Amino acid sequence: YDHTIERKYQALIWGIPNKEKGTININLGRSFKDRRIIDAFANNTLGKKAITHYKVIEQYHYISLIECELETGRTHQIRAHMKYIGHPIFNDKTYGGDKVVKGNKFTNYKKFVENNFKLMPRQGLHAKSLGFVHPTTNQKVLFESELPEDFLGVIDRWKKYNTSKNY
């Protein structure tokens, strides 16, 4: 893998990680049960090296907005790593984030979560930036992308939900 390529993503994940910043250094490889899924191999003897650095940007009680920087670029790396640490990506059907993972399962809250799934009917993962050194000019090139409307809409709803509840 090429360390000169800088990849940053933003993700909505279930729950709040124990640490505000962290590094997940766990090998990843195809699942033995379903080849479409990537599994984390904690013993690091199977799969390929995969390193994800993350930091929490904001917390909304049951979900968090994080930024991830990839040191390696494995298939489904962020999705598999977040599932491995118990914080699957919001509305990620493949890796278990498409149901109420954190919080109670009672009617009003469950409806609130399901409405957010409808507002953003995809996983809560966004490619924020891609940077590299141009091969002929040797200049650093950086492409950035703002969070899309559906993603921002879900964040806004969680902020409002957060302030409307007394914990």
Where are these regions (language model features)?
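RNA pseudouridine synthases
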Residues: 1-167
